[in-house]
Structure formats: C-alpha cells, structure tokens
C-alpha cells in the first residue's frame, strides 16, 4: 500500500509506503520532506492536491486513502511567532544613570587619548591601556556597592570594551557593530537604525558627542569638511609644491601638490599653434571689410556691390542703417546670398593647418561675383609667368582697348610669414576685340618672349617645418612635330608612312604613297638623290640595300627584292627578306614554325625526286622507242634499221674513266639519286646537304654545255676519227660462249663506216644534254656494279688497237644497258 505523488513539473510519480489504509496530510508532508531532502519544513511549505479532482488538502489532520495520486507544490513558509519578553524598567534606569556618570569621567580622562588618536576605534585590536581601566574603576566606585547586578551591568556596558564584546541588547547580528559606529545602520552591520550613538562616540566633523556624523548639523558647511591627504609615494620632492590646499602630505606636516610640467606643456602648445592660423596670415580677400576679421558665414550683397561680408556684420549694418556699405539704399537683409565658394575656401584653409604654398595657392581662389553679370570672353593670355622676373607683364592689346571691365579672375598665392619668397601670379583676361585683332601679334610676341627669355634664377624658398611639399616647376618641352632629322628613332608602327624615314612600314609591297615629296624629317635634302629621279615623281630612289648617310637603315626598303642580300640564299622564303611583310599570317609559335619548316623541306625533296625520276624515265622511254622502231623496220634496208650511233671519241672514253675514278664525279652521281632521309642526321646536316645539292644542280647545266661544246668542236675538226672499241659491253656478253664471241667479233668487223656529220650533230637543247647525262650516269652505275661483282682486271681498261669498234657492237651495248636499267627500275 502506498501513496503516489509528484511535483507538477515532474514526469513520473514517486511512491511513499504506508501501513494502514489511510495517512494524514501532516504525516505525508513529513515523509515528503524526508525523501526529497527539503529540510525540516520551516523555510517552505507544501500544498497537496488530488491529481484527479484537483482538491487541495488544507487541513493537516485530513485522511488520504491508499493508492491515491496527489500533486504537490512548494509555497513560502508560514511566518514565525515572535517571542515577547517582559521588560524590567528598574534595571534600565540604573544602567542609564551609571552610563551617564561614566561618560562624564571618561570625557575628562580621554582627552589625551583623542590627541594621540584622531578617532575612536582606529586602533581596533590594541589592548586597553591603564587610563581606560582606571575609568572603569571610577565607574564602579560611583555605582552602589551593594548592588552586584549593577556592577556587572556597568562592566558589560563599558564603552572601552565594546570592540571585543557585544552587548545582549544589540539591534542586529552585524559584524561591524562596536567597531566604530560611524557608518549607517550601525557600522557595517544591518538592522534597525540607531538614533542614539553608543557612549563614547564623538562626531568627527564637530567633535561633539551625542549624535552620529550623518546627523551632524554641520553637514554641507565646507569649513567643517575633513581634508584627507595621501602620502606622495613614488613622486620626487622636486616635483611637489607646498600649498595650503594640497592633497599630498609632506614630512614637515604641510600639504603639497604636483608642479606643472612647463616643458611638456610648451611643446604641446607649440604643436597646437603650428596647426592653427592667425588672422594676419589670411589674404585680405578672405577678411570682412567691416570687422577686419576672417569672414564667418560669408554672405554676398547681390543687389548692389556684389561683395562678401560676414553674415552677421552685413545683416546688422543693413538693419541698423537701412543701407549697404557701398551706400546703396534699396537693399534689404533678405537680399543677402550665402557665398558657398568663399565659405568652402575658408573652411579648407582652416582645416588644412599647414603653411604649404601649394595648398594655399590651390585653395585661395577667389572669384568676384561681377563676373557673373559680365562674363568676359575666355582667351589665353600671352603673358609669361611672373616667377622669372617677379614683375607683372601686361598683355599686348590695341590702343582702342577699353578699360571699363574689371579683372574677373585673380588667383593669388598666400604669402605667409615663414614663406616670404612666394610669387604672386595674376591672370588678367584679354578683351575680345584685342584678341581678334592682335592674335597674330600676341602669338609672335609670346614666341619671341619664350625664345629671348633670360635664364631663370632659382630663388631659395624658406619653407616651414609643417610644409608637406614644394611647388614643382614645369619645364618647357618641344612638341613631337618640331623634331627634325637628328631624331629619327621612330618605331615601326602600322601607319601608312614614316615621316622620319627609318625604314618602311609593314604591308608596303613596293608601292608607297608617302614619298611624293621630301619627308618632314629631311631638312635640306632635295627630291632626287645622286641623280636618281626615283620610280615616282619627286620620290626617293629605291635604295638597293645601301644605307644612306647613317639615316636610312640598310634593312629592306619597301619591296622585298630591294634589300640585302641581292642574291637570296637557297631555299629561302622571299617573304623573310621583308620587314614583317607577311602580316596576313598570324603569329606562330616555335613548334608551329619548326613543323612548317620540316614540311617545306619534305616538299622540296619530293619535287627533286619527281623531277629527276621523270627525266630518267622520259629519256629511257625515248631510247626504247627508237630501238624498237629500228628493230621493227623493213629487213630490206638493214642499215636504216640500225640507227647510226653518235661519234664517240677517245677523249670521251678517257673522260668516262676519269669520272669513274674522281671523287668529285662520284659525289655528284651519288647526289643525283634521291636523297634518303636518315634519322641519325641532324637538322644542320640536312640543310647543308640541301644547299650543296642545290649548288650542284645549278652548276650542272653549265658543265654539260661546256663539255658539249668541246665534243662538237672535236667532232667538227676530225669527223673521220675511229670509234674506240674499249666501250664497256654487257656482262652477259663477256661471259658468253666462244662461238657467240667470235661471231660478234666478225659482225663487228663487218660493220658499216661512220655516219655523216649531220646525223651526229649534237642538239643544243638543255633537255637533250640532261637526258644524255642521266643515261651515262645510269650506265656507269651498272658497270660499277658489274666490276664490283665480277672483279674486273685492270688490263681491261687498256685499249687494244687491234680490235676496231663497230656500230653493231656499240648499238648492242647501249641497248643492253638500257634494257638492264629499265629492268632494274621496274
């Protein structure tokens, strides 16, 4: 059996066991206090209510049945019942009498103690000395001797012993009670306020006992204020100055204060004065004509004189006299306009706080409002700056120039006391008529003044310490168009013409329109150079790669073919000779350039192979067709069937043998074959081979023509020369059977005589000689292979005069060679 309970804020129920079927409310509260550790129940109370019916059990004797669920909540405890004791007035009267007698005795004896201690209770933990004990004895003597209780009470209430013993009739449990009762609420204790101080308490303001200090009648009177001094810890005596109103106590008993630091104060004041301006430093344009001070809230008299004044000064003047300073009487105070420009100028000068002439000159720009009514035409004045001579130079004008207009703009630089070397610049406008009539005269005068101006002397400027910068003087510089021939360093730009003649602009492929006269940079040069009229009327002649007097760079001039070198190197792109002439192509990188270069080389090699291979094939085809036609001709005419061979002299045989043995000829034949690209060759070797091959191909026609002329001359002079029989025959004829060799020898001996001269006349065309040259090289290669395989003896190179060559043998030799070359090519 149990009772279920929980707080309202709890989630689960707790149980309290019980013995019977019922339990009282008081017993249930005690068990709840015990289980929840709520103390004895004196500080708080618990209200119990039914969880289902919300019925509160207010009576502690009320019975609660078992298995009931209740809710509990805490409430403040009930007020305690005070204990009231009966007072004994007789004992109190005796105590008061005893205390009154003791106060009289203590007041008389405690005077030396007050001299030693400035207040009672300062030395709280000292042992009472003999006079205090003597006063206690006197108090006991004054009390009745037969009353023991009175003596004990008097001993307990002795004021000298209040610091270590607390009376039973104290009004609060505070710790501070009895330790100098000068504070509110009985010192640092608390409780009900005590209006009557304890015996022996003396007010510190008036030195009268009977009241606390907060009840003293002298509160608020400065004559009774207590001065508190402190020791000058860490302060040297040299920095202390004795005064009656000091706060530091000196060893002599006087009081002192700190001396002011004059040096630091002067430095601070100097810093403040350096950032402020005096009234005399401001220009007169910023001062009010009435008060002679810097204008405050500058206002403009818009109806009369258009001058600026202080707003207060001019307003008071108009209200008092009903007239302006200039004498106009039709003005009102409402007609004044604020001069914003002047106000901003004054504010900037005051805020700047420095004496820089640059800042002052830029800020002190005063514009008179008369220019608003009569704005003069803006014109440049030809007067030079007054910085050179220190004097103002008037602008040149005509005699009939009117002087009715006042100067509209005056720019003055502030001349301060520490910057006395500044120069005032005044810029005056020029009349419109004077500008129109004398513009040319003024321009000439300005130019003459600029040219004839003496050298300026630099005047030293005395600048203050707070100045931020110096005024920079602009030096006159010549314009770019006035430069002549010596300054011809003009960059190569995209313009159509170059006025300084330092080469040609890109994109001018031989046509330039900028050379129809003498260029501006050529002072003193005539139209034609050294008698050359030039390709255009009055233009420069084409300089074929030659520099002219150090002015013209010897780089390409205009067209591509007019530059160095005159003969371009082999396999060079002519566009490379120009100065970036091929601008239509985009700028390529190094990789793209190398790839393009390799591709061009490969194309050239392919062209060379095709040209050489085509010539050889064409020559071989021609010879084969001729032989076939000779073989297939009519058998009636055997001589016409066999074409007469060309005359071959002994010189030709010797030249062939020398060509076979000479390394130059071998190298030339080696290069006639298509070049094989080797991966081991570097780029430099490949370029070198291509250049050398190009040179040999270029020299090959000349050598062929020269040899042909020699052969033609010899053949014409000696047409009946016998044909040498030492020509090489085919390898198959040399290894044939004896019957065939003897038959061939007989056939050769019966050959016909030499053909006429007209049939062997050489053809003068280069193609014919070139094809013959190719045939000879092919024949030599085949014979060389035969010699290498069959190891020919050196005796075969010797001539045998006994055997005469025949036409049939020579024709058979050539036919066999051609057929072998064709078979090898196929």
Swiss-Prot record:
Q: Where is this motif: Nuclear localization signal 2?
A: 695-702
- Where are the annotated RING-type zinc-finger regions? 288-326
Q: Where are the zinc fingers (CCHC-type)?
A: 203-216
Q: Which GO terms describe its cellular component?
A: nucleus
Locate the compositionally biased regions of type Basic and acidic residues. Answer: 588-624, 651-667, 680-706, 809-826
Task: State the phenotype upon gene disruption.
Answer: Increased tolerance to paraquat-triggered oxidative stress associated with PRMT13/PRMT4B, APX1 and GPX1 accumulation due to increased histone H3 methylation (H3R17me2a).
As annotated in the record, motif Nuclear localization signal 1 runs over: 668-675
Chief location bin: nucleus
Name a biological process GO annotation: response to oxidative stress
Task: Explain what induces or represses this protein's expression.
Answer: Repressed rapidly by oxidative stress such as paraquat, hydrogen peroxide H(2)O(2), mannitol, drought and cadmium ion CdCl(2).
Q: Which residue ranges have biased composition labelled Basic residues? A: 790-799
| The UniProt record lists the keyword Nucleus | yes
On whether Chaperone is a keyword of this UniProt record, the answer is no
Q: Which reaction does it catalyse?
A: S-ubiquitinyl-[E2 ubiquitin-conjugating enzyme]-L-cysteine + [acceptor protein]-L-lysine = [E2 ubiquitin-conjugating enzyme]-L-cysteine + N(6)-ubiquitinyl-[acceptor protein]-L-lysine
For the region Disordered, what residue ranges are annotated?
Answer: 356-406, 435-488, 585-826
Q: What class of enzyme is it?
A: transferase
EC id? 2.3.2.27
Stretches with biased composition (Polar residues):
356-365, 396-406, 435-454, 625-635
Q: Which residues form the DWNN domain?
A: 3-76
The entry lists its GO molecular-function terms as: ubiquitin protein ligase activity; ubiquitin-like protein ligase activity; zinc ion binding
* Cellular location(s): Nucleus
User: How would you summarize the oligomeric state and partners of this protein?
Assistant: Interacts with PRMT13/PRMT4B in the nucleus.
Q: What does this protein do?
A: E3 ubiquitin ligase acting as a negative regulator of oxidative stress tolerance, probably by mediating 26S proteasome-mediated degradation of PRMT13/PRMT4B, thus preventing APX1 and GPX1 accumulation via the reduction of histone H3 methylation (H3R17me2a). Confers sensitivity to cadmium CdCl(2) and salt NaCl stresses.
What protein name does the entry list? E3 ubiquitin ligase PARAQUAT TOLERANCE 3
Which species does the entry assign this protein to? Arabidopsis thaliana
Question: Which classification does the entry list for the species?
Answer: Eukaryota, Viridiplantae, Streptophyta, Embryophyta, Tracheophyta
